[in-house]
Amino acid sequence: MFRTMLKSKIHRATVTQADLHYVGSVTVDADLMDAADLIEGEQVTIVDIENGARLVTYVITGERGSGVIGINGAAAHLVHPGDLVILIAYGTMEDAEARAYRPRVVFVDADNRPIDLGVDPAYVPPDAGELLSPR
């Protein structure tokens, strides 16, 4: 049996731009892509913390060190600059691999620079303010 599991996520990133007239996708700073083990063209789900919008798209590589999280195409109707979002990538794996797999969890600061890397999808860094862990 195959299971679809959380592969990686970038938690509470700030959207820096939105371009309705682009062909689609989300532009992500190359440093964040590396931290979250994302590659260009990989499918991601974007969850907008501000309004609850949830959408599926693919990643394109943004300028390294820029902090860019750019929403492109029709998704710009749902997600806007300044919104906090979670980018989630899933992977399909055999049951045994899924049970041992540790996802990459990336927390970022207000400028979308990685500040904490982990493997626990429910982990909350000590300096995360009002965020609560479900554990």
Curated annotation (Swiss-Prot):
Its EC number is 4.1.1.11. It catalyses: L-aspartate + H(+) = beta-alanine + CO2. Heterooctamer of four alpha and four beta subunits. Pathway: Cofactor biosynthesis; (R)-pantothenate biosynthesis; beta-alanine from L-aspartate: step 1/1. It comes from Mycolicibacterium vanbaalenii (strain DSM 7251 / JCM 13017 / BCRC 16820 / KCTC 9966 / NRRL B-24157 / PYR-1) (Mycobacterium vanbaalenii). It is found in: Cytoplasm. Belongs to the PanD family. Is synthesized initially as an inactive proenzyme, which is activated by self-cleavage at a specific serine bond to produce a beta-subunit with a hydroxyl group at its C-terminus and an alpha-subunit with a pyruvoyl group at its N-terminus. Its main location: cytoplasm. Substrate binds at residues 57, 73-75. Its cofactor is pyruvate. One of its GO terms (cellular component) is cytosol. The active site is at 25 (schiff-base intermediate with substrate), 58 (proton donor). This is Aspartate 1-decarboxylase. One of its GO terms (molecular function) is aspartate 1-decarboxylase activity. The modification Pyruvic acid (Ser) is found at residue 25. CDD domains: Asp_decarbox. Gene3D superfamilies: 2.40.40.20. Catalyzes the pyruvoyl-dependent decarboxylation of aspartate to produce beta-alanine. The gene is panD. One of its GO terms (biological process) is pantothenate biosynthetic process. It holds the Pfam family Asp_decarbox. The keyword Cytoplasm applies. Binds 1 pyruvoyl group covalently per subunit. Keywords: Autocatalytic cleavage, Cytoplasm, Decarboxylase, Lyase, Pantothenate biosynthesis, Pyruvate, Schiff base, Zymogen. Disulfide bonds: none annotated. InterPro entries: Asp_de-COase-like_dom_sf, Asp_decarbox. It is an enzyme of class 4 (lyase).
